[in-house]
Curated annotation (Swiss-Prot):
Nephridia in clitellum region. One of its GO terms (biological process) is egg-laying behavior. Belongs to the G-protein coupled receptor 1 family. Vasopressin/oxytocin receptor subfamily. The keyword Disulfide bond applies. Glycans are attached at N22. Residues 76-83, 146-166, 234-328, 382-420 are cytoplasmic. This is Annetocin receptor. Residues 1-54, 105-124, 188-212, 350-360 are extracellular. It comes from Eisenia fetida (Red wiggler worm). Disulfide bonds join C122-C201. PROSITE patterns: G_PROTEIN_RECEP_F1_1 (PS00237), G_PROTEIN_RECEP_F1_2 (PS50262). The chain crosses the membrane at residues 55-75, 84-104, 125-145, 167-187, 213-233, 329-349, 361-381. It comes from the Eukaryota.
Amino acid sequence: MEMDDDEAILLDDIYALASTPNQTIVTSSFPQTVSPGFLARRNEALAMVEVAVQSTILILTVVGNAAVLAMIVSLSRHKDLGRMYTMIGHLSCADLFVAIFNLLPQLLWDVTHRFRGGRVLCKLVKYVQVVAMYASAYVLMSTAVDRYTAICHPMRSHTWTSTTAHYLVIGAWVLALVFAVPQLVIFDYVEVVPGSGVYDCVDHFRPRWTLPVYITWFALAVYVIPLVVLATIYLRICVVVWKSANRKSTPMINVAARTSGATEQPSLDDASVSFNVADGGGVDLDPSGGGGSLSRHAAQLSHRQQQQQANNVVLSRAKTKTVKLTLTVVISYLVCWAPFFVSHIWSAWDPHAPFEGTEMVITLLLGSLNSCINPWIYLAFSDQLRRKVTQCCPRSWGQRPSTLSHDSTDFRSGSRPTHS
């Protein structure tokens, strides 16, 4: 079938693919390879479905994440919400960035079929689209690191504040901005076929082997490496939670056994030391009765002993709930983006990969769905956010009891301030 000029692929001057089975098109944030059959003619029915689905995802992503951010800002005016809500706010900001700078440009591009913005806008759009993808993954890793510190090293909560969490997220964004720089070189606004008058924003790789190498690097940096890091962190967290669950029947630590030379061991009513993880790993001395010598011994526990004891106490229900929330967000990210990266890596290295236009569009839509469902995950695990929604929409949502469990509502328990 002979192609029209408007539908022709970029040949000698750009792609130099006259003898290769697969050729490159751009329907996502970075290059991908598909068979020449897909390039011959745009499937208008598929394009209409893609535009409709992308529009729905875009609207839900913006509304959902903007609502979560507004609720967090409103709640923070009345009290310190702790680091977990800080990280949820950063995740929502990253998802909004994905919606505005990745989904929206892609939607407009799908509507017009050809890019209409010129050379500068072409490079800028392709750059920020990939920045959004890097940032989404790296902010997610920052959240995992924050939860790892709170659960596995509770004594660090005194120094690991919300400001520290902000710096961690800033580092994630800096990495995203740096790693996306190759997009500025790879993409350009060129005439599809010399003399045709039809321009588009396309990628150009010379030599051609750099195409699969770049796609592989992108998949490693955005998906595979974060997958390994997240799996390692949450494996460690799950081990700590599991060990804590096995000790749930002994939340108080009797320090009488540590008193050398004692012939009698006072009961917990005489003296006890309580390590409150939810309150940042502080130590509560509770002397009563005739346990004066025991109290003096407990007061002389070294910081190292305190940290060892704090790491062995039962985790609060609130912190366990934050682990469930962030783990759900991580699983959602991995599941939604897995088909996208698997199909692109496969197509990059295998000329006969079984992926055509329809399959590529579906994988792209699945990846876009991730930013859309995250706000619902936050609402599912946060009683406080749900209660805020109820207060804003009492008629449609119905009134809920105001006496909720403090630990499940605030992602923490205890009466003293905490940064976790």
